[in-house]
Amino acid sequence: MSAKKNKKKKPIVIKTSACRKIKRSDGLKMKWVQEYTFRGFLEAITSRFGNLKAYSIFGDEEDKFISYNRLKWGAENISTYLLEKGFAKGDRVAIVGESCPFWMMMYLGITYVGCVAVPILPDFSQREMEGILKESGAKAVCVNVKHFKKVEKYAYSNNLMVVRMEDLTQIPSIPEGFTFENAPGISLKEHSHNYTLINTSVPSEDDMASLIFTSGTTGSSKGVILTHKNLLVCADESSDTYVKVKKGVRVLSILPMSHCYEFTITHLLCLLQGAEIVFLGKPPATTILMRAFKEVRPHVILTVPLLIEKIYKAAVLPTLRDNPKIAKLYKNPLTKWIVLKTVKTKLISTMGGCIRFFGIGGAPLDETVWDFLYSCHFPYALGYGLTETSPLIAGCGPKHKMHKKGYIGKPVKHDHVILLNKNEDGVGEIAVKGPNVMTGYYNNEELNKEVFTEDGYFKTGDLGYLDKHGYLSIRGRVKTMILGPAGENIYPESIESLINNMEFVQDSLVVPGDGGLVALIKIDLEAMQEKLKISATDVKDEAEKYLVKLKKSVNEQLSTFSKIADTELQEKDFERTPTQKIKRFLYSRKKKEEK
Protein backbone atom coordinates (compact mmCIF):
# COMPACT_ATOMS: atom_id res chain seq x y z
CA MET A 1 0.00 0.00 0.00
CA SER A 2 1.14 3.52 -0.68
CA ALA A 3 1.86 6.00 2.09
CA LYS A 4 -0.97 8.08 0.73
CA LYS A 5 -3.50 5.32 1.38
CA ASN A 6 -2.21 4.71 4.91
CA LYS A 7 -2.54 8.36 5.82
CA LYS A 8 -5.28 8.92 8.38
CA LYS A 9 -8.18 11.07 7.37
CA LYS A 10 -8.39 14.39 9.15
CA PRO A 11 -11.49 14.82 11.30
CA ILE A 12 -14.11 17.12 9.89
CA VAL A 13 -14.16 20.36 11.85
CA ILE A 14 -16.99 22.82 11.45
CA LYS A 15 -15.43 26.25 11.60
CA THR A 16 -17.29 29.26 12.90
CA SER A 17 -16.60 31.15 9.69
CA ALA A 18 -18.14 28.34 7.64
CA CYS A 19 -21.44 28.81 9.45
CA ARG A 20 -21.71 32.55 8.91
CA LYS A 21 -23.77 32.36 5.76
CA ILE A 22 -27.20 33.67 6.60
CA LYS A 23 -27.57 37.42 6.23
CA ARG A 24 -30.86 39.04 7.14
CA SER A 25 -32.70 42.18 6.22
CA ASP A 26 -32.51 43.38 9.85
CA GLY A 27 -28.70 43.42 9.73
CA LEU A 28 -28.18 40.29 11.82
CA LYS A 29 -25.92 37.53 10.55
CA MET A 30 -26.82 34.07 11.85
CA LYS A 31 -23.94 31.69 12.56
CA TRP A 32 -25.43 28.58 14.09
CA VAL A 33 -29.18 28.57 13.40
CA GLN A 34 -31.49 28.88 10.40
CA GLU A 35 -33.97 30.96 12.41
CA TYR A 36 -34.08 32.45 15.88
CA THR A 37 -36.68 30.09 17.36
CA PHE A 38 -36.28 27.14 19.70
CA ARG A 39 -37.58 24.91 16.93
CA GLY A 40 -34.75 26.20 14.74
CA PHE A 41 -32.35 25.79 17.66
CA LEU A 42 -33.20 22.09 18.10
CA GLU A 43 -33.01 21.42 14.37
CA ALA A 44 -29.58 23.06 14.21
CA ILE A 45 -27.95 21.23 17.13
CA THR A 46 -29.30 17.78 16.25
CA SER A 47 -28.33 18.05 12.57
CA ARG A 48 -24.73 18.82 13.56
CA PHE A 49 -24.17 16.91 16.79
CA GLY A 50 -26.89 14.21 16.80
CA ASN A 51 -25.49 11.32 18.83
CA LEU A 52 -22.91 13.30 20.79
CA LYS A 53 -23.38 13.78 24.53
CA ALA A 54 -25.41 16.87 25.34
CA TYR A 55 -26.06 16.35 29.05
CA SER A 56 -24.91 14.21 31.96
CA ILE A 57 -24.92 14.54 35.74
CA PHE A 58 -21.79 14.44 37.89
CA GLY A 59 -21.63 11.14 39.75
CA ASP A 60 -23.86 9.22 37.32
CA GLU A 61 -22.65 6.16 35.43
CA GLU A 62 -20.63 6.82 32.27
CA ASP A 63 -23.33 5.51 29.91
CA LYS A 64 -26.11 7.50 31.57
CA PHE A 65 -26.32 10.62 29.43
CA ILE A 66 -28.68 12.42 27.07
CA SER A 67 -27.55 12.91 23.49
CA TYR A 68 -28.54 15.82 21.28
CA ASN A 69 -30.92 13.53 19.39
CA ARG A 70 -32.51 12.27 22.60
CA LEU A 71 -33.00 15.85 23.78
CA LYS A 72 -34.95 16.70 20.62
CA TRP A 73 -36.92 13.45 20.68
CA GLY A 74 -38.04 14.05 24.27
CA ALA A 75 -38.92 17.69 23.55
CA GLU A 76 -41.10 16.70 20.59
CA ASN A 77 -42.93 14.13 22.72
CA ILE A 78 -43.61 16.78 25.36
CA SER A 79 -44.84 19.19 22.67
CA THR A 80 -47.24 16.58 21.31
CA TYR A 81 -48.58 15.81 24.78
CA LEU A 82 -49.22 19.49 25.56
CA LEU A 83 -51.07 20.06 22.28
CA GLU A 84 -53.18 16.94 22.78
CA LYS A 85 -54.15 18.24 26.21
CA GLY A 86 -55.44 21.47 24.69
CA PHE A 87 -52.45 23.76 25.17
CA ALA A 88 -51.98 26.42 22.50
CA LYS A 89 -49.41 29.05 21.48
CA GLY A 90 -48.95 31.56 24.27
CA ASP A 91 -50.10 29.26 27.09
CA ARG A 92 -47.80 29.40 30.13
CA VAL A 93 -46.02 26.44 31.73
CA ALA A 94 -43.94 27.06 34.87
CA ILE A 95 -40.71 25.19 35.63
CA VAL A 96 -39.54 24.94 39.25
CA GLY A 97 -36.51 22.98 40.35
CA GLU A 98 -32.77 22.47 40.43
CA SER A 99 -30.90 22.22 37.15
CA CYS A 100 -30.96 18.85 35.39
CA PRO A 101 -31.29 17.52 31.81
CA PHE A 102 -35.08 17.18 32.13
CA TRP A 103 -35.34 20.88 33.04
CA MET A 104 -34.01 21.75 29.58
CA MET A 105 -36.01 19.02 27.84
CA MET A 106 -39.20 20.41 29.38
CA TYR A 107 -38.29 23.97 28.40
CA LEU A 108 -37.65 22.97 24.79
CA GLY A 109 -40.85 20.93 24.66
CA ILE A 110 -42.82 23.97 25.84
CA THR A 111 -41.29 26.49 23.45
CA TYR A 112 -41.03 24.13 20.43
CA VAL A 113 -44.74 24.68 19.75
CA GLY A 114 -44.99 28.31 20.86
CA CYS A 115 -46.05 27.85 24.48
CA VAL A 116 -44.30 30.06 27.05
CA ALA A 117 -41.94 28.80 29.75
CA VAL A 118 -42.06 30.49 33.16
CA PRO A 119 -38.77 29.58 34.89
CA ILE A 120 -39.04 30.07 38.67
CA LEU A 121 -35.96 30.28 40.86
CA PRO A 122 -36.04 27.35 43.32
CA ASP A 123 -35.03 29.63 46.19
CA PHE A 124 -38.32 31.53 46.00
CA SER A 125 -40.71 31.02 48.91
CA GLN A 126 -44.13 29.37 48.64
CA ARG A 127 -45.80 32.78 48.73
CA GLU A 128 -43.58 34.07 45.91
CA MET A 129 -44.11 30.95 43.78
CA GLU A 130 -47.87 31.07 44.21
CA GLY A 131 -47.81 34.75 43.25
CA ILE A 132 -45.85 34.01 40.06
CA LEU A 133 -48.13 31.11 39.09
CA LYS A 134 -51.13 33.37 39.53
CA GLU A 135 -49.72 36.47 37.82
CA SER A 136 -48.32 34.54 34.87
CA GLY A 137 -51.58 32.65 34.33
CA ALA A 138 -49.73 29.33 34.23
CA LYS A 139 -51.80 26.35 33.07
CA ALA A 140 -49.19 23.80 34.15
CA VAL A 141 -46.18 23.47 36.41
CA CYS A 142 -43.21 21.12 36.13
CA VAL A 143 -41.69 20.78 39.60
CA ASN A 144 -39.20 18.51 41.31
CA VAL A 145 -39.98 16.59 44.50
CA LYS A 146 -37.95 18.94 46.70
CA HIS A 147 -40.10 21.98 45.88
CA PHE A 148 -43.45 20.31 45.29
CA LYS A 149 -44.95 21.44 48.61
CA LYS A 150 -44.45 25.07 47.60
CA VAL A 151 -46.80 24.72 44.62
CA GLU A 152 -49.04 21.80 45.60
CA LYS A 153 -51.91 23.74 47.15
CA TYR A 154 -52.16 26.38 44.41
CA ALA A 155 -51.61 23.96 41.52
CA TYR A 156 -54.24 21.37 42.41
CA SER A 157 -56.81 23.88 43.69
CA ASN A 158 -56.55 25.80 40.39
CA ASN A 159 -56.56 22.71 38.13
CA LEU A 160 -53.02 23.14 36.82
CA MET A 161 -51.35 20.21 35.09
CA VAL A 162 -48.62 19.04 37.49
CA VAL A 163 -45.53 17.34 36.05
CA ARG A 164 -42.88 15.63 38.18
CA MET A 165 -39.52 16.83 36.91
CA GLU A 166 -37.50 13.76 37.95
CA ASP A 167 -39.11 11.65 35.21
CA LEU A 168 -41.30 14.19 33.36
CA THR A 169 -44.50 12.43 34.42
CA GLN A 170 -47.86 14.12 34.82
CA ILE A 171 -49.34 13.44 38.26
CA PRO A 172 -53.12 14.10 37.96
CA SER A 173 -53.59 13.36 41.67
CA ILE A 174 -51.81 11.66 44.55
CA PRO A 175 -53.67 8.49 45.59
CA GLU A 176 -53.89 7.53 49.24
CA GLY A 177 -50.72 5.77 50.39
CA PHE A 178 -48.56 7.53 47.79
CA THR A 179 -46.39 10.63 47.82
CA PHE A 180 -45.55 12.97 44.96
CA GLU A 181 -42.25 11.13 44.61
CA ASN A 182 -43.79 7.72 43.87
CA ALA A 183 -47.29 8.58 42.65
CA PRO A 184 -48.28 6.94 39.32
CA GLY A 185 -48.84 9.12 36.28
CA ILE A 186 -48.42 9.61 32.53
CA SER A 187 -44.97 10.07 30.98
CA LEU A 188 -44.57 13.13 28.77
CA LYS A 189 -41.10 12.31 27.44
CA GLU A 190 -42.14 8.78 26.37
CA HIS A 191 -45.37 9.95 24.72
CA SER A 192 -45.46 9.27 20.96
CA HIS A 193 -44.81 12.43 19.00
CA ASN A 194 -47.12 13.57 16.24
CA TYR A 195 -45.40 15.74 13.62
CA THR A 196 -48.66 16.62 11.90
CA LEU A 197 -50.02 18.03 15.15
CA ILE A 198 -46.73 19.71 16.09
CA ASN A 199 -46.62 21.51 12.75
CA THR A 200 -49.97 23.16 13.44
CA SER A 201 -48.33 25.24 16.18
CA VAL A 202 -45.15 26.83 14.88
CA PRO A 203 -43.57 29.69 16.88
CA SER A 204 -42.17 32.84 15.30
CA GLU A 205 -39.04 34.71 16.33
CA ASP A 206 -40.97 37.50 18.02
CA ASP A 207 -43.20 35.18 20.08
CA MET A 208 -42.65 35.16 23.83
CA ALA A 209 -40.45 32.23 24.87
CA SER A 210 -39.76 33.01 28.54
CA LEU A 211 -41.58 34.99 31.18
CA ILE A 212 -39.03 35.44 33.96
CA PHE A 213 -39.85 37.00 37.30
CA THR A 214 -36.69 38.64 38.60
CA SER A 215 -35.41 38.61 42.16
CA GLY A 216 -34.35 42.18 42.76
CA THR A 217 -32.15 43.70 45.45
CA THR A 218 -34.78 46.42 45.85
CA GLY A 219 -37.53 44.06 46.95
CA SER A 220 -39.73 44.16 43.85
CA SER A 221 -40.21 41.27 41.42
CA LYS A 222 -41.04 42.02 37.78
CA GLY A 223 -42.06 39.76 34.91
CA VAL A 224 -39.56 40.06 32.05
CA ILE A 225 -40.82 39.14 28.57
CA LEU A 226 -38.11 37.51 26.44
CA THR A 227 -38.79 36.32 22.91
CA HIS A 228 -37.23 33.42 21.01
CA LYS A 229 -35.15 35.97 19.12
CA ASN A 230 -33.99 37.79 22.28
CA LEU A 231 -32.48 34.66 23.80
CA LEU A 232 -31.06 33.02 20.69
CA VAL A 233 -29.52 36.19 19.25
CA CYS A 234 -27.74 36.66 22.57
CA ALA A 235 -26.45 33.07 22.54
CA ASP A 236 -25.47 33.26 18.87
CA GLU A 237 -23.63 36.58 19.08
CA SER A 238 -21.99 36.05 22.48
CA SER A 239 -19.73 33.39 20.98
CA ASP A 240 -17.80 36.23 19.32
CA THR A 241 -17.57 38.56 22.31
CA TYR A 242 -17.51 36.25 25.30
CA VAL A 243 -16.96 32.51 25.03
CA LYS A 244 -16.00 30.26 22.12
CA VAL A 245 -16.13 26.52 22.67
CA LYS A 246 -15.43 23.54 20.44
CA LYS A 247 -17.33 20.33 19.85
CA GLY A 248 -16.94 17.95 22.80
CA VAL A 249 -15.68 20.56 25.27
CA ARG A 250 -16.72 19.75 28.87
CA VAL A 251 -18.79 22.40 30.65
CA LEU A 252 -19.60 22.20 34.36
CA SER A 253 -23.05 23.64 35.13
CA ILE A 254 -23.32 25.02 38.67
CA LEU A 255 -25.94 27.79 38.66
CA PRO A 256 -29.74 27.38 38.49
CA MET A 257 -31.02 27.20 34.89
CA SER A 258 -33.76 29.65 35.88
CA HIS A 259 -30.93 32.19 36.11
CA CYS A 260 -30.83 33.83 32.65
CA TYR A 261 -27.01 34.01 32.60
CA GLU A 262 -26.73 30.26 33.15
CA PHE A 263 -29.52 29.42 30.70
CA THR A 264 -28.32 31.54 27.78
CA ILE A 265 -24.55 31.30 28.06
CA THR A 266 -23.85 27.94 29.71
CA HIS A 267 -26.64 26.09 27.91
CA LEU A 268 -27.87 27.74 24.71
CA LEU A 269 -24.48 29.05 23.59
CA CYS A 270 -22.57 25.88 24.50
CA LEU A 271 -25.16 23.52 22.98
CA LEU A 272 -25.04 25.53 19.76
CA GLN A 273 -21.35 24.66 19.54
CA GLY A 274 -21.52 20.98 20.46
CA ALA A 275 -20.34 21.02 24.07
CA GLU A 276 -20.98 18.33 26.67
CA ILE A 277 -22.64 19.91 29.71
CA VAL A 278 -22.23 18.18 33.07
CA PHE A 279 -24.62 19.20 35.84
CA LEU A 280 -23.13 19.39 39.32
CA GLY A 281 -26.44 17.96 40.55
CA LYS A 282 -25.82 18.97 44.17
CA PRO A 283 -25.48 22.18 46.21
CA PRO A 284 -22.06 23.71 45.40
CA ALA A 285 -20.37 22.95 48.74
CA THR A 286 -16.58 23.21 48.63
CA THR A 287 -15.97 19.46 49.06
CA ILE A 288 -18.43 18.58 46.27
CA LEU A 289 -16.94 21.18 43.93
CA MET A 290 -13.41 19.90 44.52
CA ARG A 291 -14.51 16.35 43.65
CA ALA A 292 -16.35 17.57 40.56
CA PHE A 293 -13.36 19.60 39.37
CA LYS A 294 -11.11 16.55 39.74
CA GLU A 295 -13.45 14.04 38.04
CA VAL A 296 -15.11 16.18 35.35
CA ARG A 297 -11.96 18.19 34.53
CA PRO A 298 -14.06 20.96 32.94
CA HIS A 299 -12.83 23.26 30.21
CA VAL A 300 -15.58 25.82 30.86
CA ILE A 301 -17.24 27.03 34.07
CA LEU A 302 -19.63 29.93 34.42
CA THR A 303 -20.58 31.18 37.85
CA VAL A 304 -21.34 34.19 40.02
CA PRO A 305 -18.45 36.09 41.69
CA LEU A 306 -19.12 34.56 45.12
CA LEU A 307 -17.53 31.24 44.10
CA ILE A 308 -14.19 32.63 42.92
CA GLU A 309 -14.18 35.10 45.83
CA LYS A 310 -14.53 32.20 48.29
CA ILE A 311 -11.73 30.28 46.57
CA TYR A 312 -9.52 33.40 46.65
CA LYS A 313 -10.16 34.08 50.35
CA ALA A 314 -9.73 30.43 51.36
CA ALA A 315 -6.78 29.36 49.21
CA VAL A 316 -5.02 32.40 47.74
CA LEU A 317 -5.22 35.28 50.22
CA PRO A 318 -3.82 33.37 53.24
CA THR A 319 -0.82 32.31 51.13
CA LEU A 320 -0.12 35.86 49.97
CA ARG A 321 -0.73 37.41 53.37
CA ASP A 322 0.36 34.93 56.05
CA ASN A 323 3.50 33.34 54.57
CA PRO A 324 6.31 35.89 55.25
CA LYS A 325 8.58 34.68 52.43
CA ILE A 326 5.82 34.65 49.81
CA ALA A 327 4.43 37.97 51.07
CA LYS A 328 7.87 39.54 50.62
CA LEU A 329 8.24 38.17 47.09
CA TYR A 330 4.70 39.29 46.22
CA LYS A 331 5.33 42.87 47.36
CA ASN A 332 8.49 43.15 45.28
CA PRO A 333 7.63 44.18 41.67
CA LEU A 334 10.65 42.21 40.39
CA THR A 335 9.58 38.90 41.96
CA LYS A 336 5.80 39.29 42.11
CA TRP A 337 5.38 37.44 38.80
CA ILE A 338 6.96 34.28 40.27
CA VAL A 339 4.33 34.12 43.00
CA LEU A 340 1.52 34.88 40.56
CA LYS A 341 2.63 32.16 38.14
CA THR A 342 2.87 29.58 40.94
CA VAL A 343 -0.53 30.46 42.41
CA LYS A 344 -2.16 30.47 38.95
CA THR A 345 -0.83 26.97 38.24
CA LYS A 346 -2.12 25.74 41.59
CA LEU A 347 -5.52 27.36 41.02
CA ILE A 348 -5.93 25.77 37.58
CA SER A 349 -4.85 22.41 39.00
CA THR A 350 -7.46 22.74 41.75
CA MET A 351 -10.11 23.18 39.04
CA GLY A 352 -9.11 19.96 37.29
CA GLY A 353 -6.20 21.19 35.21
CA CYS A 354 -8.14 21.79 31.97
CA ILE A 355 -9.89 25.10 32.61
CA ARG A 356 -9.83 27.39 29.57
CA PHE A 357 -12.72 29.70 30.38
CA PHE A 358 -13.91 30.77 33.83
CA GLY A 359 -16.88 33.05 33.21
CA ILE A 360 -18.00 35.43 35.93
CA GLY A 361 -21.31 37.30 35.84
CA GLY A 362 -24.55 38.00 37.65
CA ALA A 363 -23.08 40.38 40.26
CA PRO A 364 -20.07 42.71 40.70
CA LEU A 365 -16.69 41.05 41.22
CA ASP A 366 -14.62 42.11 44.22
CA GLU A 367 -11.96 44.54 42.98
CA THR A 368 -9.06 42.84 44.81
CA VAL A 369 -9.98 39.43 43.39
CA TRP A 370 -10.35 40.99 39.95
CA ASP A 371 -6.89 42.56 40.23
CA PHE A 372 -5.38 39.20 41.21
CA LEU A 373 -7.02 37.30 38.32
CA TYR A 374 -5.88 39.98 35.89
CA SER A 375 -2.32 40.09 37.21
CA CYS A 376 -1.77 36.32 37.11
CA HIS A 377 -3.30 35.95 33.61
CA PHE A 378 -5.91 33.49 34.87
CA PRO A 379 -8.32 32.51 32.02
CA TYR A 380 -11.28 34.39 33.46
CA ALA A 381 -13.85 36.41 31.57
CA LEU A 382 -16.29 38.98 32.88
CA GLY A 383 -19.78 39.39 31.53
CA TYR A 384 -22.22 42.19 32.23
CA GLY A 385 -25.93 42.15 31.64
CA LEU A 386 -29.40 41.74 33.08
CA THR A 387 -32.30 39.35 32.71
CA GLU A 388 -33.93 42.14 30.68
CA THR A 389 -31.14 41.86 28.08
CA SER A 390 -31.16 38.05 27.76
CA PRO A 391 -28.64 38.71 29.54
CA LEU A 392 -25.31 39.76 27.99
CA ILE A 393 -24.65 43.43 27.20
CA ALA A 394 -20.85 43.48 27.32
CA GLY A 395 -17.94 41.18 28.04
CA CYS A 396 -14.61 39.87 26.84
CA GLY A 397 -12.97 36.51 26.29
CA PRO A 398 -10.43 34.81 28.58
CA LYS A 399 -7.30 35.89 26.70
CA HIS A 400 -5.27 38.40 28.71
CA LYS A 401 -4.72 40.69 25.72
CA MET A 402 -8.50 41.15 25.46
CA HIS A 403 -8.71 42.43 29.05
CA LYS A 404 -8.43 46.00 30.19
CA LYS A 405 -7.98 46.52 33.90
CA GLY A 406 -11.12 47.90 35.53
CA TYR A 407 -13.29 47.32 32.44
CA ILE A 408 -15.82 44.59 31.67
CA GLY A 409 -15.17 44.60 27.94
CA LYS A 410 -16.92 45.80 24.81
CA PRO A 411 -20.65 45.57 24.05
CA VAL A 412 -21.76 42.45 22.18
CA LYS A 413 -22.35 42.78 18.47
CA HIS A 414 -25.58 44.56 17.49
CA ASP A 415 -25.96 46.12 20.95
CA HIS A 416 -25.72 49.90 21.05
CA VAL A 417 -24.77 51.24 24.48
CA ILE A 418 -25.03 54.88 25.54
CA LEU A 419 -24.70 56.71 28.87
CA LEU A 420 -27.52 58.92 30.12
CA ASN A 421 -27.14 61.98 32.37
CA LYS A 422 -23.35 61.83 32.48
CA ASN A 423 -21.57 63.68 35.28
CA GLU A 424 -18.34 65.67 34.94
CA ASP A 425 -16.33 62.43 35.12
CA GLY A 426 -18.22 60.91 32.20
CA VAL A 427 -20.15 58.45 34.38
CA GLY A 428 -23.81 57.98 33.51
CA GLU A 429 -26.63 55.47 33.52
CA ILE A 430 -26.05 52.63 31.07
CA ALA A 431 -28.76 52.35 28.42
CA VAL A 432 -28.86 49.73 25.69
CA LYS A 433 -30.72 49.04 22.47
CA GLY A 434 -30.45 45.78 20.55
CA PRO A 435 -32.13 42.53 19.45
CA ASN A 436 -31.49 40.90 22.84
CA VAL A 437 -33.40 43.55 24.82
CA MET A 438 -36.74 42.45 26.27
CA THR A 439 -40.01 43.62 24.76
CA GLY A 440 -41.06 44.90 28.19
CA TYR A 441 -42.33 44.00 31.64
CA TYR A 442 -45.43 41.84 31.79
CA ASN A 443 -48.66 43.74 32.51
CA ASN A 444 -46.78 46.85 33.62
CA GLU A 445 -47.12 49.65 31.07
CA GLU A 446 -46.31 52.32 33.63
CA LEU A 447 -42.94 50.75 34.40
CA ASN A 448 -42.25 50.15 30.70
CA LYS A 449 -42.65 53.88 30.04
CA GLU A 450 -40.22 54.56 32.87
CA VAL A 451 -37.44 52.16 31.80
CA PHE A 452 -37.45 52.84 28.06
CA THR A 453 -36.38 56.14 26.53
CA GLU A 454 -38.46 57.70 23.76
CA ASP A 455 -36.01 56.40 21.16
CA GLY A 456 -36.14 52.82 22.48
CA TYR A 457 -33.13 52.50 24.79
CA PHE A 458 -33.56 50.35 27.90
CA LYS A 459 -32.29 52.04 31.06
CA THR A 460 -30.39 49.44 33.07
CA GLY A 461 -30.20 51.28 36.38
CA ASP A 462 -26.43 50.71 36.40
CA LEU A 463 -23.81 53.45 36.33
CA GLY A 464 -20.98 53.09 33.86
CA TYR A 465 -18.18 54.71 31.92
CA LEU A 466 -17.19 54.15 28.28
CA ASP A 467 -13.61 54.84 27.26
CA LYS A 468 -12.55 56.05 23.82
CA HIS A 469 -12.01 52.45 22.65
CA GLY A 470 -15.54 51.39 23.58
CA TYR A 471 -14.66 49.45 26.75
CA LEU A 472 -17.34 49.56 29.44
CA SER A 473 -16.62 50.00 33.15
CA ILE A 474 -19.36 49.46 35.75
CA ARG A 475 -19.33 51.99 38.59
CA GLY A 476 -22.35 50.92 40.65
CA ARG A 477 -26.13 51.05 40.75
CA VAL A 478 -28.15 54.23 40.38
CA LYS A 479 -30.31 53.17 43.33
CA THR A 480 -27.39 52.13 45.57
CA MET A 481 -25.27 55.21 44.86
CA ILE A 482 -25.15 57.40 47.96
CA LEU A 483 -24.95 61.18 47.86
CA GLY A 484 -22.21 62.65 50.03
CA PRO A 485 -22.63 65.72 52.28
CA ALA A 486 -21.87 68.09 49.40
CA GLY A 487 -23.58 66.06 46.68
CA GLU A 488 -20.60 63.80 45.93
CA ASN A 489 -21.27 60.39 44.36
CA ILE A 490 -20.33 57.55 46.72
CA TYR A 491 -20.26 53.99 45.38
CA PRO A 492 -20.70 51.61 48.35
CA GLU A 493 -19.43 48.61 46.36
CA SER A 494 -15.91 50.12 46.27
CA ILE A 495 -15.87 50.59 50.05
CA GLU A 496 -17.20 47.06 50.59
CA SER A 497 -14.37 45.69 48.46
CA LEU A 498 -11.81 47.27 50.79
CA ILE A 499 -13.57 45.94 53.88
CA ASN A 500 -13.99 42.42 52.49
CA ASN A 501 -10.26 42.02 52.04
CA MET A 502 -9.48 42.74 55.67
CA GLU A 503 -8.55 39.75 57.82
CA PHE A 504 -11.47 37.86 59.44
CA VAL A 505 -14.10 39.65 57.30
CA GLN A 506 -16.59 37.31 55.63
CA ASP A 507 -18.94 39.91 54.16
CA SER A 508 -19.95 43.56 54.42
CA LEU A 509 -22.57 46.07 53.38
CA VAL A 510 -22.27 49.86 53.38
CA VAL A 511 -25.52 51.78 53.77
CA PRO A 512 -26.44 55.41 54.48
CA GLY A 513 -27.21 56.32 58.08
CA ASP A 514 -28.42 59.51 59.71
CA GLY A 515 -24.88 60.37 60.83
CA GLY A 516 -23.04 59.21 57.71
CA LEU A 517 -22.09 55.87 56.20
CA VAL A 518 -22.65 52.72 58.24
CA ALA A 519 -20.71 49.52 57.51
CA LEU A 520 -22.41 46.26 58.52
CA ILE A 521 -19.64 43.68 58.82
CA LYS A 522 -19.85 39.90 59.15
CA ILE A 523 -16.80 38.55 60.99
CA ASP A 524 -15.54 34.96 60.93
CA LEU A 525 -15.68 34.50 64.69
CA GLU A 526 -14.34 30.94 64.59
CA ALA A 527 -11.24 32.00 62.66
CA MET A 528 -10.70 34.92 65.03
CA GLN A 529 -11.09 32.70 68.10
CA GLU A 530 -8.64 30.16 66.73
CA LYS A 531 -5.97 32.66 65.66
CA LEU A 532 -6.14 34.85 68.78
CA LYS A 533 -6.46 31.85 71.13
CA ILE A 534 -9.42 33.31 73.01
CA SER A 535 -12.56 31.75 74.46
CA ALA A 536 -15.94 31.62 72.75
CA THR A 537 -17.35 33.99 75.38
CA ASP A 538 -14.70 36.64 74.65
CA VAL A 539 -14.65 36.49 70.86
CA LYS A 540 -17.62 38.80 70.28
CA ASP A 541 -16.06 41.56 72.42
CA GLU A 542 -12.81 41.08 70.54
CA ALA A 543 -14.68 41.39 67.23
CA GLU A 544 -16.20 44.71 68.34
CA LYS A 545 -12.71 46.01 69.19
CA TYR A 546 -11.46 44.76 65.83
CA LEU A 547 -14.15 46.77 64.01
CA VAL A 548 -12.73 49.97 65.53
CA LYS A 549 -9.29 49.17 64.09
CA LEU A 550 -10.82 48.09 60.78
CA LYS A 551 -12.75 51.35 60.47
CA LYS A 552 -9.56 53.37 60.99
CA SER A 553 -7.60 51.29 58.48
CA VAL A 554 -10.28 51.47 55.77
CA ASN A 555 -10.93 55.19 56.26
CA GLU A 556 -7.24 55.89 55.64
CA GLN A 557 -7.78 54.59 52.11
CA LEU A 558 -10.95 56.60 51.41
CA SER A 559 -11.71 60.16 50.38
CA THR A 560 -13.07 62.47 53.08
CA PHE A 561 -16.68 62.35 51.88
CA SER A 562 -16.80 58.53 51.66
CA LYS A 563 -15.34 57.67 55.07
CA ILE A 564 -17.25 55.27 57.33
CA ALA A 565 -18.97 56.98 60.26
CA ASP A 566 -19.98 53.84 62.14
CA THR A 567 -19.64 50.05 62.06
CA GLU A 568 -21.99 47.30 63.19
CA LEU A 569 -21.21 43.64 63.81
CA GLN A 570 -23.47 41.63 61.51
CA GLU A 571 -24.14 38.38 63.35
CA LYS A 572 -26.36 36.62 60.77
CA ASP A 573 -25.61 36.03 57.10
CA PHE A 574 -26.97 38.74 54.83
CA GLU A 575 -30.13 37.82 52.98
CA ARG A 576 -29.38 37.37 49.29
CA THR A 577 -31.11 36.96 45.99
CA PRO A 578 -30.61 33.62 44.16
CA THR A 579 -27.81 35.31 42.19
CA GLN A 580 -26.07 36.04 45.51
CA LYS A 581 -26.62 39.79 45.58
CA ILE A 582 -27.38 41.19 49.03
CA LYS A 583 -30.93 42.48 49.42
CA ARG A 584 -29.85 46.00 50.32
CA PHE A 585 -33.37 47.27 50.92
CA LEU A 586 -33.57 45.16 54.09
CA TYR A 587 -30.65 46.91 55.80
CA SER A 588 -31.26 50.65 55.66
CA ARG A 589 -29.97 52.51 58.72
CA LYS A 590 -31.74 55.80 58.01
CA LYS A 591 -34.62 56.59 60.34
CA LYS A 592 -37.93 57.22 58.63
CA GLU A 593 -38.83 60.87 58.50
CA GLU A 594 -41.59 61.84 60.85
CA LYS A 595 -44.79 62.76 59.09
Residue spans for each PLM region:
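Conserved AMP-binding/adenylate-forming core of the ANL superfamily
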Residues: 54-100, 104-108, 125-130, 228
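Conserved AMP-binding/adenylation subdomain of ANL enzymes
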Residues: 232-250, 257-344, 354, 379
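Conserved ATP-dependent adenylate/AMP-binding module captured primarily in the ANL superfamily
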Residues: 122-156, 234-252, 285-299
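ANL superfamily adenylate-forming
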Residues: 150-205, 315-346
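Conserved pre-ATP/AMP-binding loop-to-beta segment of ANL
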Residues: 50-53, 183-213, 220, 244-250
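Conserved ATP-binding/catalytic segment of the ANL
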Residues: 425-484, 501
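Conserved C-terminal "lid"/linker of ANL adenylate-forming enzymes
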Residues: 482, 507-510, 515, 549-595
